[in-house]
Regions:
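Flavin-dependent oxidoreductase catalytic cores
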Residues: 1-356
Length: 356
């Protein structure tokens, strides 16, 4: 099996190694546009010899903004701003894909000025906020909104695009029977619950052409007692491959607890079993994310064929040049302790390690 520092091909894109910087909201955008702080952040990541950098989630619609500091991709006006981020990474020798993230039922009215939307009308379990059910026509429009956002991403010069379909955001909520209680073509069976995501991927492929890498961060199973099992998530991954998706980043879907996917006490990578199942089911590249800190764990995951690449985020918040330190054996592990202090700083419009 190829090692951590072997090249990886995703569609026509070749990245120099199998380390991925996974996306996270950074809270630093200014009115949806790239800030100077973000240019500096991504410029430093671009110098770090990371195989592929995935940006924080770009909102495909104004109503889908998940945080006040989120980047936008719902207007052509955003293209020159996004290009500054891309240029900063490319000047350092890196490659960058843009993630698209619609907050859906996780959005807050104080950010969007609107009632949050989702697959079904219900109350949000934490905030108590009433969620408005999207109509069929609105879903069709959202498919086009995602495709237009991906077109802007390509025009800004990004090397690829990733859809966020995990962590309870809009696409993830459609995949879960807990939040999707519809009885039409967009809900019910597992296949129908996947229709929104699949049609979005197909629409994006038509917009982007055959050679532009399309990736999906996919919640393979829900960490909720009434949620979807991993078997459904694996089948969704199969369908996405058939629809022209080029890579899957394995994560979790609906969360009973927001901090479930950022666990301080984990002693091993979180999603090994789910990733192994997906890797056995599809032929496109699979990324494993979640709690990976040690070089020997990374090498084990690759050597055993569990995944094709290793995704990390908090480690790069603390050490943007971690890849070079691992390559030269100056360290055997990230220094990150998963204290999650970076989350507190993010809420204040700054993405940084709280203990460095």
């Amino acid at each position: 099996m190829p090692g951590l520092f072997a090249p990886l091909t995703i569609n026509k894109m070749v990245v120099e190694n199998r380390v991925v910087r996974s996306a996270t909201l950074d809270g630093m955008a200014q009115n949806g546009m790239v800030s100077e702080a973000e240019i500096a952040l991504y410029g430093e990541l671009g110098k770090g010899r990371i195989g592929l950098i995935i940006s924080h989630g770009l909102a495909p619609t104004r109503e889908g903004q998940a945080s006040p500091g989120q980047l936008s991709a719902f207007s052509d006006d955003a293209i020159p701003s996004l290009k500054k981020m891309v240029d900063a990474v490319h000047e350092g020798g890196g490659k960058i894909a843009a993630q698209i993230l619609h907050g859906g039922w996780m959005c807050r009215p104080e950010v969007t000025g609107l009632q949050p939307v989702g697959p079904s009308a219900l109350l949000h379990p934490r905030s108590g906020q009433a969620i408005r059910e999207l109509s069929g026509d609105e879903i069709v429009q959202l498919v086009e909104d995602y495709a237009q956002a991906s077109r802007r991403i390509r025009e800004a010069g990004f090397d690829g695009v990733q859809l966020h379909a995990a962590h309870s955001w809009l696409l993830s909520a459609f995949l879960s029977p807990v939040t999707n209680r519809r009885g039409d073509e967009w809900g019910g069976s597992a296949a129908k619950r996947a229709n929104f995501l699949r049609r979005t991927c197909i629409s994006m492929r038509r917009k982007l052409g055959p050679d532009f890498p399309i990736m999906v961060k996919l919640g393979i199973r829900d960490y909720h007692p009434e949620g979807k099992p991993s078997l459904e998530g694996v089948e969704t991954a199969r369908m996405l491959e058939a629809d022209g998706v080029d890579a899957i980043e394995v994560s979790e879907g609906l969360e009973a607890d927001f901090f479930h996917h950022i666990r301080k006490d984990a002693t091993a990578p979180y999603y090994l079993d789910e990733c192994r199942q997906v890797r056995q089911a599809i032929s496109i590249p699979v990324f494993l994310v979640g709690g990976i800190r040690r070089l020997d764990d990374m090498e084990m995951v690759l050597s055993e064929g569990i995944a094709d690449a290793i995704s990390m985020c908090r480690s790069f918040i603390m050490e943007p040049h971690l890849v070079e330190r691992l390559r030269s054996r100056l360290t055997e592990s990230s220094k990150c302790t998963s204290c999650n202090g970076c989350l507190g700083l993010m809420s204040k419009g700054r993405l940084a390690c709280a203990i460095v």
